[in-house]
Amino acid sequence: MVLLAAIDQGTSSSRFLVFEADTGELVTSHQIEVRQLFPHGGWVEMDPMELYDTVVSCISKTIEKLENLGISADEIKSVGVANQRETSIVWDKETGKPLYNAIVWLDTRTSSLADEAISRTASKSKDEFRAKTGLPIHPYFSALKLKWLFQNVPEVKKAYADGNLMFGTVDTWLIWKLTGAYVTDVSNASRTLLLDLHKRKWSTQLCEFFDLPIEILPEIRSSAEVYGHFDKGPLEGVPLSGCLGDQQAAMVGHQCLNAGQTKNTYGTGTFMLCNIGTRPIISKNGLLTTVGFQFGADSPVVYALEGSGSIGGNVVRFLRDNFKFISDAKEMEGLCRSVEDTSGAYFVPSFTGLYTPYWDSTARGTILGLTQVTQREHICLAALRAVAFQSAEMIAAVEQDLEGGTKVTTLKVDGGMIANKLFNEIQADIMGRDIVTPKITEISGWGAAVAGGIGAQQISLDEFLQQSSEDNRYTPQKDDNWRSAELARWKEAVKRSCGWAQ
């Protein structure tokens, strides 16, 4: 038996998962929730040591479960990493200790730094470097987070002066802690705002513009090769041989390996990736151009257009924790099925701004259309619809950017929210596309495990593609007139939320 394993470190939890190479079947796993810290409004941090410690604990617990099944840990032939992207960590090379909390991708503290950077560009535009990086100048990406750390954390400047400063996204931190290798993969590097997308190298121009030292950045490697081996613990000697940003890992897990194939992940936020092949397309419609994957140093880089949404599972959590409308996410479906519509209510849950296609970090959440008959059921249904509306806007942007009029006819979806069948029906109706759910629920983990297996030569792409991935398919039940009217109303609601925090 060949087992492929994956570390999946996300905004909500750390996981370690073990899959059968031949079938993709999940053999066993362990998950530990991780804390998000909110020291100020708009600030979101995590403890880097907690991220590492929970990963190590998940590995140990999973190995215990594996052995209880009568399976030896020796059957694990490779490990891949899927990680929350953009989240930025600085640490001391000598002590191995973080110099500050991880600044999470959702964090907006660098909004003023983004404005200042935009004002220094020749075009006075957030898109000054989009042709080179595929990204706008925005607080979402790592470059501005690192700049803030240099400006505000004296320990960072001291470590740099002493030649001990290390910086990376979560993948780099974990791989370094587990193997000693100081690397990132090309998919994660493409999320920093420091990568030249065409050369796949750190950009001297961008590092100089943001006043960041290029020499502290990790080595860029492909998504599937041996970076190092576990240096201690129950996996000692096992190759760590795959790495993908979590959304790219989901794209691989869904088998979106050919141009035009598209997936949408509903995690804390919402992330749509459309495979665009080996030539990057720079979006004119508010999408990001990002690296999808590269399976080996000598293989071509495959790119993707990405819609990144700030609205996702965090909306359900908000309804549970802040409004107390539900005590458990599982209550949402029954509650929402008890009403026919939202009674005219529209919920724009832009708590930390809006991403694709608006890129407005000053947008804030709003509920419109409340009347004396509005109940919590209507607000909950409006929340589910908000997530689907956001995805519909992403699909429209993708299709406008795709050359040759390519249509996205099917959307492959994953994430915690798709357990709600009503939500899948809502997606199909609002987007006017077939919605396909996967057999494998841990799709990001599976994608990372496959990358690790390819990197360690334990599985081939052909073997992977022979496996069936589809579970259920939902088809639209509403017509185009209904869809157009609803989307127009949604866009009107979004307008009201934009610019609020200026």
UniProtKB/Swiss-Prot annotation:
Pathway named in the protein's UniProt entry: Polyol metabolism; glycerol degradation via glycerol kinase pathway; sn-glycerol 3-phosphate from glycerol: step 1/1
The keyword Acetylation is assigned to this record: no
CDD domains associated with the record: ASKHA_NBD_FGGY_GK1-3-like (cd07792)
Positions contributing to substrate binding: T11, R85, Y140, D246
PROSITE patterns: FGGY_KINASES_1
Domain of life, source organism: Eukaryota
GO molecular function, one term: ATP binding
Gene3D superfamilies membership: 3.30.420.40
A Pfam family that the UniProt record links to this protein: FGGY_N
Binding residues for ATP: R15, T268, G313, G416, M417, I418, A419, N420
PANTHER family, per the entry: GLYCEROL KINASE (PTHR10196:SF69), SUGAR KINASE (PTHR10196)
Name this polypeptide is given: Probable glycerol kinase
Biological classification of the source: Eukaryota, Metazoa, Ecdysozoa, Nematoda, Chromadorea
